[in-house]
C-alpha cells in the first residue's frame, strides 16, 4: 500500500465509514453542525475536538480574509454546500496586511467532502506525511505572491462569486484577471472501494481587464461555462510595460498547485522602460511588432540589446520601392535601349564585376559627383538584367528550365556568385540524358567547374541513355572524342561506343568523314567481340574507305589472334575502361600449405575484389616448387623475384601482366637471393638484402621496368634476411630481420635514394623477423612475426616506436597490404607445427581495431600479397 493510502487507512477510514463529520473539520461519535449569523461572521460548534477532514489550503497571511455573509449549512446529506458571498462594495473595507492568523482561516470543507488524489492531480502526489494544510504553511512559502487563492467547492446551482481584496502594489499595475481551471475533489480510496461522492467540479472564467487603472487589484471570478481555462496573466513590475503572459498556479483537489509557485518579480529597472509594443523578454513574437519577432537581451546591469531580425528585409523592401520610383538612385544602366536606374552601393555589394566597373568609371569620369553614372552594356538581354536586379533587391527570383541557362550565363559573367550557386543547384536537379551534354559544354565555356564536373559525371554514368538521344549527334568533334574516349565511360559493351561513333559521322558525312580515323581511335576495338569485328566493323564502308581505319581494325584482329604477343601491343586502345570491370584487388601469389605435418607448394594465384567480396582465379605460377620469393606491384603488373627451388637460390624475375593475365620471365638479378625484400620507389624496383648462396647478403640493387636494366646502389650497413621493409616519407626503411648469427637483428636501417646513403640505429624495441611492414597515414606498421599477434608502430617524424592493437591471430610468414585506407593482413602460420591460417583481418585506423574478414580460398603462408587494378570480366 502506498504511503498516503496507509495514512488514510490509519487516520481517516473510521470517520469516513460513519459519515460523522463536523463543519469545522472534526469528527466524533455524534456531530451537529450549526451556524449562527453574526455581524459579518459565523460560529460553528462541535462535540468533539478530534481531528477530522483536511481543510483547504490556508491562504498566506499576505492575502486578507474575505468578508463573508451568512450561509446555510446542512448535515446528513451528500449535497453539501459551501458559499462565500462578497458584495462589490466590501472590497473597499478589507483588512490590510498583517491581520492575525485567527482572522485569516478558511471555512474548510463541508460534510461528506474529503481530500484525495484526483486525475487532475496525478502529476503532483504528496511527498510527505503532512496533510495539505500543513504543507501550505505560511512559513513554507514566505515569498509567495498574491496569486495563491482560497477556493471552495460545492454543487450549489446558483452563481458563486469570490472576490478578494489585495493590498495596493508599490507601483501602478493594471487589473489582472485570472481564470482558474477545473477543480475536482474526490476521496482517495483503495481500488476495491468506490468513491462515495461524485466529482464536485468548480469552473471559473474571467472577463477582460478594465482599461483604466484601479486603486487596488481586484480579482473577480464568476462561474462560467465548463472547461474554459485561458492562460492567466501576471502584471509586470517594469514601469510602462503592459501585461506579460505568466503561467499562474492552479489549485487542484488535494491542495497542491498544478504549476509551481512563481517567485516574486524582480525589482523594477528604470532604464528598461520600453513601449508596450516591445516585449520585455526574449519570448515569443508579438503581434504588435512591426517586423515580426523582436528580441530584447540583457547584456549587463541596466543594459539591453534590441534585435529586429526583420530589419534587413524591410530595408531591402524600401530600397526596391525607391528603385522602382527612381528615387535616390545614382547609377543608370542602358541595355538594348532600356534604362535601369539603381543604387551603386546595392549593386556593388552583390556583384564583383559591377563593383570594379563602378570604381573605374568613377575614377575616369569627369562628371560632377551629383550627376548619375551611366553604364552602357552589350551582349546582355534587358529581360535578364531585370531579373538579376529583382534578385539583388528582393533576394528571391523564380527560376525555370526556360531561363536557368540564360540566368547562369549572365550571373557568371557579372560575378553574382550567390546567384550562380542557386542556378547550379537548379540545373543539377534538371540534368537528363537529353540535356546533360549541352549543360556540360555550357559549364566548360563559362568555366563553372562545379557544374562541369556534375554534368560530366552524370553523362559518363548514363552513356547508354545519352547515346540514344539526338543531342549527342550535335556536339562538336572535340567534345565528342573527349566523351567517348574517357576511361570512366559506363558501357557494358564496346560495340555500343562503335555504333555511336558511326552515327555521329553519318549525321553529316560530308564534313565529318574526314575525322573517321581519329574518332575510331577513341573506340577500344580490341575489346569488341571477334565475330562482331569481322562481320560488322570490317564491312563498314566508312572503314573500308580509310586506310587509317583499316589499320586500327587489323590491330584489334591481331590482339585476338595472337594473345602471346599482347605484351607488345600496349596502347590506350588495349586498356579496358574502368566501368568494364576494372577494380582494385588484393592478389595472393603462391605460398605454402600445411597438409598434416608436411608442407606443399602452391602455384595458385587468386585475387579478392572488396567491392563484391568475391575471389577470382588468375594465371597460375609457371613453376611448381618455389618458395621464399618476393613479390611487388609496379603499376598494374606484378614482379616476382628470386626465391629457392629444390635447394637452389634463384635470380629470376617474372612479371605478371594484369591485362594479359599471364606470367613472363623478364629479367634476372645480378645477385641470386631468397628471403629478401622488394619494394617500389619512384617507379623503380629495389631488392634489399636476403639470403644468398654463401649466407646473408648486404647487396641492394634497383630495376628499371622501362629499360629492363639493373643498377647496384649502396649496400645495407647490416646484412639481414627475413626483415620488414617499406617506403615512408621519401625514405626506404628496413626493420629487424635475421642477422648472420641466426638471431633477430635489433636494428633499424634507413636509405635516402637521392643521396644513395644508409643510416642505422640499434634498438631492443626492434626484434621482428618473418613479419611484413606497410605504411599508412605517415606511420609504419610491423605486423606479427615470431608467432605473435603484436602490432608495432613507428613514427618517422618523432623517431619513436610504440605498440599498436593486437591482431586476432598470431601470424608468422604472413603478408600485408594497404587498400582503401585500411591494412589487410593475410594468411600466416600460428606456430612451427601449424596450423596455417586461411583468413584475413583488416585494421581500421579510425577505430584502432582489427576485424576478421571472410576466409581465403585456402590456408596459406610464405606467400606474396600485392594490390593492383585488375580487369574482372562480368560473370
Swiss-Prot record:
SMART domains: BACK (SM00875), BTB (SM00225), Kelch (SM00612). Residues 270-280 have a biased composition (Low complexity). Transmembrane segments: none annotated. It holds the Pfam family BACK. Residues 131-140 have a biased composition (Basic and acidic residues). Keywords: Kelch repeat, Repeat. Residues 113-145, 240-291 are annotated as: Disordered. Kelch repeats lie at residues 585-635, 637-683, 684-730, 732-778, 779-821, 822-870. The keyword Repeat applies. Residues 329-401 form the BTB domain. SUPFAM superfamilies: Kelch motif, POZ domain. Residues 113-126 have a biased composition (Polar residues). This is Kelch-like protein 29. It comes from Mus musculus (Mouse).
Amino acid at each position: 500500500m502506498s504511503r498516503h493510502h496507509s495514512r488514510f487507512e490509519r487516520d481517516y477510514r473510521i470517520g469516513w465509514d460513519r459519515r460523522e463529520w463536523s463543519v469545522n473539520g472534526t469528527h466524533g461519535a455524534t456531530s451537529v453542525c450549526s451556524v449562527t449569523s453574526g455581524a459579518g461572521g459565523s460560529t460553528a460548534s462541535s462535540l468533539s475536538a478530534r481531528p477530522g477532514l483536511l481543510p483547504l489550503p490556508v491562504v498566506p497571511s499576505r492575502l486578507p480574509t474575505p468578508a463573508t455573509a451568512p450561509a446555510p449549512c446542512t448535515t446528513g446529506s451528500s449535497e453539501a454546500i459551501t458559499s462565500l458571498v462578497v458584495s462589490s462594495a466590501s472590497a473597499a473595507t478589507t483588512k490590510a496586511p498583517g491581520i492575525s492568523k485567527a482572522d485569516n482561516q478558511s471555512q474548510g470543507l463541508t460534510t461528506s467532502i474529503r481530500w484525495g488524489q484526483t486525475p487532475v492531480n496525478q502529476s503532483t502526489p504528496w511527498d510527505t506525511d503532512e496533510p495539505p494544510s500543513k504543507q501550505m504553511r505560511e512559513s513554507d512559502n514566505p515569498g509567495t505572491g498574491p496569486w495563491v487563492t482560497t477556493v471552495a467547492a460545492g454543487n450549489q446551482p446558483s452563481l458563486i462569486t469570490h472576490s478578494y481584496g489585495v493590498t495596493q502594489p508599490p507601483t501602478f499595475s493594471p487589473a489582472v484577471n485570472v481564470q482558474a481551471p477545473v477543480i475536482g475533489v474526490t476521496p482517495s480510496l483503495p481500488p476495491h472501494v468506490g468513491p462515495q461522492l461524485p466529482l464536485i467540479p468548480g469552473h471559473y472564467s474571467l472577463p477582460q481587464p478594465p482599461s483604466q487603472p484601479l486603486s487596488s487589484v481586484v480579482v473577480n471570478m464568476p462561474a462560467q461555462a465548463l472547461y474554459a481555462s485561458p492562460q492567466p496573466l501576471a502584471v509586470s513590475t517594469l514601469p510602462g510595460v503592459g501585461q506579460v503572459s505568466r503561467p499562474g498556479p492552479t489549485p487542484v483537489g488535494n491542495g497542491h498547485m498544478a504549476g509551481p509557485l512563481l517567485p516574486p518579480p524582480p525589482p523594477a529597472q528604470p532604464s528598461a522602460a520600453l513601449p508596450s509594443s516591445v516585449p520585455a523578454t526574449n519570448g515569443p513574437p508579438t503581434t504588435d511588432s512591426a517586423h515580426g519577432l523582436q528580441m530584447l537581451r540583457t547584456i549587463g546591469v541596466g543594459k539591453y540589446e534590441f534585435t529586429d531580425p526583420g530589419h534587413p528585409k524591410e530595408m531591402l523592401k524600401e530600397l526596391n520601392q525607391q528603385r522602382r520610383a527612381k528615387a535616390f538612385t545614382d547609377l543608370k544602366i542602358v541595355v538594348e535601349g532600356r534604362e535601369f536606374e539603381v543604387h551603386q552601393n546595392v549593386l556593388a555589394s552583390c556583384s564583383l564585376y559591377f563593383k570594379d566597373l563602378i570604381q573605374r568609371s568613377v575614377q575616369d569620369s569627369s562628371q560632377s559627383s551629383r550627376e548619375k553614372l551611366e553604364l552602357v552594356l552589350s551582349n546582355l538581354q534587358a529581360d535578364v538584367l531585370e531579373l538579376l536586379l529583382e534578385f539583388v533587391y528582393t533576394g528571391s527570383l523564380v527560376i525555370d528550365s526556360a531561363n536557368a541557362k540564360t540566368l547562369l550565363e549572365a550571373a557568371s559573367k557579372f560575378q553574382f556568385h550567390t546567384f550562380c550557386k542557386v542556378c547550379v543547384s537548379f540545373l543539377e536537379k534538371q540534368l537528363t540524358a537529353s540535356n546533360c551534354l549541352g549543360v556540360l559544354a555550357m559549364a566548360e565555356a563559362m568555366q563553372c567547374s562545379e557544374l562541369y564536373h556534375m554534368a560530366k559525371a552524370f553523362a559518363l554514368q548514363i552513356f547508354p541513355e545519352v547515346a540514344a538521344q539526338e543531342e549527342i549527334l550535335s556536339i562538336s568533334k572535340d567534345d565528342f572524342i573527349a566523351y567517348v574516349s574517357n576511361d570512366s565511360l559506363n558501357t557494358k559493351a564496346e560495340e555500343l561506343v562503335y555504333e555511336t561513333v558511326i552515327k555521329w559521322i553519318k549525321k553529316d558525312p560530308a564534313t565529318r568523314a574526314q575525322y573517321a580515323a581519329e574518332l575510331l581511335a577513341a573506340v577500344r576495338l580490341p575489346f569488341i567481340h571477334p565475330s562482331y569485328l569481322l562481320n560488322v566493323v570490317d564491312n563498314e564502308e566508312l572503314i573500308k574507305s580509310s586506310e587509317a581505319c583499316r589499320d586500327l581494325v587489323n590491330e584489334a584482329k591481331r590482339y585476338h589472334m595472337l594473345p602471346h604477343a599482347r605484351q607488345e601491343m600496349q596502347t590506350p586502345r588495349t586498356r579496358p575502361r574502368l566501368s568494364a570491370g576494372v577494380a582494385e584487388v588484393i592478389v595472393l601469389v603462391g605460398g605454402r600449405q600445411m597438409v598434416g605435418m608436411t608442407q606443399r607448394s602452391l602455384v595458385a594465384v587468386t585475387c579478392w575484389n572488396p567491392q563484391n567480396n568475391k575471389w577470382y582465379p588468375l594465371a597460375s605460377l609457371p613453376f611448381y616448387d618455389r618458395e621464399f620469393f618476393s613479390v611487388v606491384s609496379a603499376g598494374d603488373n606484378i614482379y616476382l623475384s628470386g626465391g629457392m627451388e629444390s635447394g637452389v637460390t634463384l635470380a629470376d624475375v617474372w612479371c605478371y601482366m594484369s591485362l594479359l593475365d599471364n606470367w613472363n620471365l623478364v629479367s634476372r638479378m645480378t645477385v641470386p637471393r631468397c628471403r629478401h625484400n622488394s619494394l617500389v620507389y619512384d617507379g623503380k624496383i629495389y631488392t634489399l638484402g636476403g639470403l644468398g648462396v654463401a649466407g646473408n647478403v648486404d647487396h641492394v640493387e634497383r630495376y628499371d621496368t622501362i629499360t629492363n636494366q639493373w643498377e647496384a646502389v649502396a649496400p645495407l650497413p647490416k646484412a639481414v634476411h627475413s626483415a620488414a621493409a617499406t617506403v615512408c616519407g621519401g625514405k626506404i626503411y628496413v626493420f629487424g630481420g635475421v642477422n648472420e648469427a641466426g638471431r633477430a637483428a635489433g636494428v633499424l636501417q634507413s636509405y635516402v635514394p637521392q643521396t644513395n646513403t644508409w643510416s642505422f640505429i640499434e634498438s631492443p624495441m626492434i626484434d621482428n623477423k618473418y613479419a611484413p611492414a606497410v605504411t599508412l597515414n605517415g606511420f609504419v606498421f610491423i605486423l606479427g612475426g615470431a608467432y605473435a599477434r603484436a602490432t608495432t608502430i613507428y613514427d618517422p617524424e618523432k623517431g619513436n616506436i610504440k605498440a599498436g592493437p593486437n591482431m586476432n591471430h598470431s601470424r608468422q610468414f604472413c603478408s600485408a597490404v594497404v587498400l582503401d585506407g585500411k591494412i589487410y593482413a593475410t594468411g600466416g602460420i600460428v606456430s612451427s607445427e601449424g596450423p596455417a591460417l586461411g583468413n584475413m583481418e583488416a585494421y581500421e585506423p579510425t577505430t584502432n581495431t582489427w576485424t576478421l574478414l571472410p576466409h581465403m580460398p585456402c590456408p596459406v603462408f610464405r606467400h606474396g600479397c600485392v594490390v593492383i587494378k585488375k580487369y574482372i570480366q562480368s560473370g
